Amino acid sequence: MALWRSTVIVSAMTMLSRVLGLVRDIVLLNVFGAGKDFDTFVVAFRIPNFFRRLFAEGAFSQAFIPVLTEYKTSRTHTEVQILISRVFGCLATVMTTLTMVAIIAAPLIMYIYAPGFHSDPEKFALATDMFRLTISYLLFMSLTAFASSILNSYGSFSTPAFAPVLLNAAMIAGALWLTPYMAEPIMALGWAVIIAGILQLAIQIPELWRKNLLIPPKIDFKHEGVDRIMKLMLPALFGVSVTQINLLLNTIWASFMQDGSVSWLYSAERMTELPLGLIGVAIGTVILPSLSARHTEQNPEKFRGMMDWAAKVIVMAGLPASVALFMLSTPIIQALFERGQFSFEDTQMTALALQCMSGGVIAFMLIKVFAPGFYAKQDTRTPVRVGLMAVAANAILNVIFIGFFKLIDWEAEHMALALASTGSAMVNAGLLYYYLHKRDIFRFGSHWKKIFLQFMFANVVMIAALAYALSWYNADVSQWMRVLEVLILCVVGVVAYVAALLVAGFRPRHLKP
């Protein structure tokens, strides 16, 4: 039950963060709209945000937690403290250097990253200034991820999971109260991001101190633990960040498309992050320390059992989430974003992107379960090979879909990028499972046939229920009524799905870890 308790804690904090994130997006799109200024913020913040996800949900955690868990399990507390001190010093040194280089090279980075902006000098200059400001978040974010990884390894999940809430709260406050004091109103978001980074790191400190793990940093790149983490992390930097790399590449493509394309894709991506963060990231965060411990204990049966449980939860939640996002795309976008500077055309364009991305939600969630199966065994090379193939698939699919939409003269070219991201995620998840199965690390056993049929039956029932409920949906009402209608649609879907699962014979005890 410890796994469920930890998962519920992380999911609850993630839900709070995601809900506040939706409020944040509503506020930002209402204040700035889906136009040139907001495009510059999305592009400029994409790079530090990429590193945030790389560290908080990616390479650093995947490399550091297994090594720290091994130290905690088989060595003394003093040796653990020494490891933490050395990693702290080395990480702070590398990130400070990287941040300074990025600030100096900001124009070059923006020219490479968003070449389409260069044709508009004002837009390019604003994006460069915004990047110089937001990239400072990189140092605070990396140290926050370091502290969070330590706490997660010791079974403390609530404080690290709460940290993203502060980023959303700071950005809302910046948009509402800092904007009037800025020559360029959008720059208020950059300052809000830096304030959030400081707060996210600060809230970790008391709990580290209580656990006697608040150790002064010392630089020692030759320390055995640091050396192992670096060797694991270098390939993991690519392997666990495929989704973010694809988003970066998609942003480059989108910078050449019509104004608003970056914002439409961003808004649609935010909708997919709700189920991904609530279930996928929560499960991935919780199981990595446990899988690492099972590997250290050399207990393959418990290892496989834990992965089977995680996959079951992911498929049970991910399939209906994908279906619901596709069917409810327009009502959701209308209810959340269509106000102020965000027009009905923006709603249509964002909904199209969301429909294209919805099919990849289950794949993105499965990646969060399959990848830790390798990282817990300190195997970072396999995800790298898979990641290379996924990035190649994304690039090829981008060319194919963009070419096709140009051929048929389709106005919503940004849909091509969303479809390519979905296809790339499916390739990534499929190949990760192939190698897990091939190496007898994890496979869907014969019991999955019944489970899969139960899930499919429940999804069909949910589709029918939502289709009927949508016939009563009315967009010509007040904003709050739209929100209420969407909530009712979601309740109808959940009730229909759960009821169908029970009719099919699925019971809560089947989700026991």
Task: Show the residue positions of the predicted features.
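Membrane-embedded alpha-helical bundles of multi-pass transporters/translocases
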Residues: 1-513
